[in-house]
Amino acid sequence: MTLTIKIGTLNDSDQSAVHNGTENGSDFRKITPTEEEICDDVVLLWKEEPGTEDATIQHLYDRITERNQSWKLSASRFRKILNEHHLYDTDLETVSLYKDKIHFPKALDSDAKVEVKFIDDEHGRGLFAKRDFSKGQIILKENKPIVYIPPLDKLFLISNGKACARCGKALYDLTQHKIMVHYLDCEVCKAIWCSEKCKKAHASLHELLYHSWRSNRIDILHAGNWKRFVNYCEKYCFTAAFSVGLIYGSMLLDTTGEVKEQWQKLASISQRERIKLRDASGIGSTFSLLNGTTVHTEEESDNGTKKGVEKNIDDETVWEKCYELFCGAFPKASEEIDFEKFLTMIGTFNINQYNGQVYHWISFINHDCEPNAYIEQVEEHEELRLHARKPIKKGEQIRITYVNPLHGVRLRRRELRVNWGFLCQCDRCQNELSTFERVPNLEKKNADANLGVEKIDSNDNSEDGSKKSTGNRKSSMREAQPDLKEILKNGKEFELDIPETVDTQGNVRKTSVRFDSNVSVAVDER
């Protein structure tokens, strides 16, 4: 028996056919991408390869066309779209912000360790230390959020008794004996709580939302309409609207008025204002998925029946339908909450939430790219502990970071601008920005000059071919990387730099494992 090694191509990757203009025997035609598709892929590229956030526009164009070889996209249109969507602003100081439209209530608060002070109209309020704190010391604890919001993607498991009705914790280790002994299940539906603590905190709200007919509370909530509202939020991943519904329902049940009082102390902004600064809407969006800014799509066909073709739905349409269902669930809601106030409640949740929950003290803490404090989550993401990252003096403002501290200055500021409406002016940002100004990038000047003389052609009549850039400026983040141990304490996602190598022509490339369309096969020749 003789074995022969033969090399063939994967059956779904005939590269020669693509380059020759045909694929599987049929004509291969390039498609013109939409502005949304271009923006989404640029932001996704920045997420996947943080080093490209500071690349020249020519290098960025080369990477995008390399990733999407089926696109018909000219360099002039690419630059025009990025400028219009503020994805390649040379001066971020000139872009739109919504910080001036955020309303800061005058309400203040304090305890033995910290106090809330009003800073000014631009910065609103901040949390200040009332005593000295050493590095690593716990500044404060928040045992629970204003209202606990279960993860939207776990509602199916919750409705089938596979996850806790309050916190969403999986119930695989909860025995039937324990459920019966501690009465952890609902008498009417399949809902189960993971502990007596969760049931005590959530049972009354669950009764109102899903079984209001039992307690004669139909006048304030219609259980059937509540399910329709929740289903709609699930369909469009509208976490903020779902959260607002739970918070409003808790306000109706709270005889002490504490929930409403804490909610009214939060900084507020309409979601309509926030959505104007969205730079992309797909998987690569700078906007957080939690912030209710995912692409709204529905499946339909020409005859109206559901089919596997997706159609984008306007944000306004989703908001209006969601508000209609919200008022259907809460019959008296329209008397005090109109459509614009509903959007303000959504925006308020988004700018104050921390990992999907709204906490009283945490909502007052401002941002800094080199914070003096960090947050630790314990007990299934319910309790928060605020630790001192460095020594804090009495009267000093306590700050945390809102964004990934390992990102470059441009990406950090872009995320802050889009998600919270301001540009960070901290010392670290200023130092990194000054580094860009001090170190001129000749490649960028040349690329910008070449693209600047192009006539802007939105119809993509210009040639797409262009020379590859020969290098890429390193992210300024590498000049001021925080200590890794400190980053881990922040409990936030971060990315590690990938080593770079230089080839014989001086081109900078990422070290990686390469895969192609070839496959080796051992053939038995008899």
Swiss-Prot record:
GO CC annotations on file: chromosome; cytoplasm; nucleus
Single annotated GO MF: histone H4K20 methyltransferase activity
Protein family (similarity comment): Belongs to the class V-like SAM-binding methyltransferase superfamily. Histone-lysine methyltransferase family. SET5 subfamily.
Region of interest (Disordered), residue spans: 450-492
Broad enzyme group: transferase
Compositional bias annotation for Basic and acidic residues: 476-492
Domain of life: Eukaryota
Gene Ontology biological-process entries: methylation; negative regulation of gene expression, epigenetic
Organism expressing this protein natively: Saccharomyces cerevisiae (strain YJM789) (Baker's yeast)
Record localization: Nucleus; Chromosome; Cytoplasm
Coiled-coil annotated spans: none
Enzyme nomenclature, EC number: 2.1.1.-
Methyltransferase listed as a keyword: yes
Stretches assigned to the SET domain: 112-403
Protein name from the UniProt record: Histone-lysine N-methyltransferase SET5
Lineage of producing organism: Eukaryota, Fungi, Dikarya, Ascomycota, Saccharomycotina
Keywords per UniProt: Chromosome, Cytoplasm, Methyltransferase, Nucleus, Phosphoprotein, S-adenosyl-L-methionine, Transferase
General function of this protein: Histone methyltransferase that monomethylates 'Lys-5', 'Lys-8' and 'Lys-12' of histone H4 (H4K5me1, H4K8me1 and H4K12me1, respectively), thereby controlling gene expression and remodeling chromatin structures.
Reactions mediated catalytically: L-lysyl-[histone] + S-adenosyl-L-methionine = N(6)-methyl-L-lysyl-[histone] + S-adenosyl-L-homocysteine + H(+)
Gene name linked to the record: SET5
